[in-house]
Amino acid sequence: MKHTVERAVLRVALILLLGTVAQPVSRKLEARQHWWDLAQNELAAALNVRDNWNVAKNVIMFLGDGMGITANTAARIFKGQKMGMNGEEGYLTWERFPNAALLKTYNVDKQVPDSAATATAYLCGIKTNYYTLGVDPMVTLGDCAAGRNPLYHTPSILQWAQEAGKDTGIVTTTRITHATPGATYAHSAHRDWECDGNLGTMGIGCKDIADQLVHDNPGKYIKVILGGGRQAFGAGLGNELNTTCIRKDGRNLTQEWLDDKKLRGASASYVTNYGELSDIDPDETDYLLGLFADSHNPFEVDRLVGPNGSPSLKDMALKALKLLKKSENGFFLLVEGGRIDHALHDNLPHRALEEAIALDSAVAAVLKEVDMEETLVVVTADHSHVMTMNGYPDRGNDILGLVSDLSEIDNLPYTTLMFTNGPGYNYSVVEDKVVRHDPSTVNTKHIDYRSQAAVPTPPISETHGGEDVAIWAVGPMAHLFHRTHEQNYVAHAMAYSACIGPSAKNCQRPSHATFTRGPLAKPSVREPGSGRGSGEPKFPTLSPVLQQLLDDNQQKIVTALGTETVKSFSNTADVQELLGRSALPHSM
């Protein structure tokens, strides 16, 4: 039955695929029946979503720094338009997850947050003060004495995972000592204390963040560390103009990191480019440190491709995954697309959207390599930005282009994506009148086009936004994300899913819950030879195009195969993987 169903589904999918490929991409507006069918198919899928009550062996958190709702929507359209579609009708990978919620991002002392305090919230489960990292609200900005007090330190979910015997990893396109990754291992009264050269008089007596990563718990036990920031470790190559944090103590912390692993009898490697990363054999490597830039990693569009270049976010995530999957007890992995934030601070929407698409690519690649029955995957942002989508552009209008209507005040065009503040403030005075720059005189689709902003914010940086951000989840206990939550709830929900940290002894599932993986699983009642673990080969991984076809043509598949046939197999893990790559809700 299984192989018959497999052949039938693939046959129908192939017919659909050939039918689509044979037709040129259409940018026509959809008719009435399209919307009716789309809604009915989505309703059918929603009615068949099941909650996964398993204990998560693995937890993977993807963080799009600054990827608020507007940035997410713009990235979705941008992705679709790069594929030749109108754009609005598409999806980012995580938008197909079965569970979603909103998160309130404010800090203890700020209505609009920064990335250090938000990282402390979603990684440590405690909201805290602006610009502080891995400490509770008893520590105010720059208070070194309070920041040293271990009573005020907030352990992260990465530390909880280590205490449960899991391997851990952090991957980022920013400096590895930056706010998001830093909250997994560091405790600092000031997020800028990334190296001793930045401590100043306020930080005398405090340990810098890079030093904490190399020598303190839990940093020195992190199995995979991939990102930028060689300067903070005293290992800068000196070939970059940006100097952000220069060590004054003369130490090379990358060598100290290697020495620590050697002392503990572990195999460890330090790499600085794509070629060296590619050559790493996961089976021969216990610890991996990769620092690919003196400061932040290059933007995706600037990244040098080749052995001497920098790895992409996807490259780093997949290498980290290969090392961490060796752990019999599972793992926790944080993957940050951190430069979305930097582009938005500069009012550079094209760069920001390219970074978001790089994150989308990383998420899609990782989903193919993990078992979603035992892996919780969440995708979220730490905060938003003040970018807006405005005007009334036509359907399919280039997301980086101009709105067709002119302003009735100054009779000038404007772009769909603009900012309420930032360095894009671009006005001049002509005969005692303030005149806005005409964006039609430049290429607004250029990678370095700076969108207009209403208010200048010195010195050059746009601010964050204070509205809620979204979180998407799939896998064990993903249904815990279900409404508007405080941002610090995220760490608690992830810990409960994996039965670690505060939930190590308190992660009971209700009596009606069913389990297919892990310590709470009941004996299988599936037919012999069905499903994973039976020794039979898994179905081949679906291409994104074929996956989208299956998602969008559920009713056609039901019609072709018959309702009873579909019902007979839609609950098996194998066909769930075929129809949804195990990362998406049931299609039938």
Predicted features and spans:
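His/Cys-centered metal/cofactor-coordination and adjacent catalytic loops
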Residues: G134-L151
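Glycine-rich phosphate/pyrophosphate-binding loops
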Residues: H153, L158-Q159, E163-A183, P502-C507
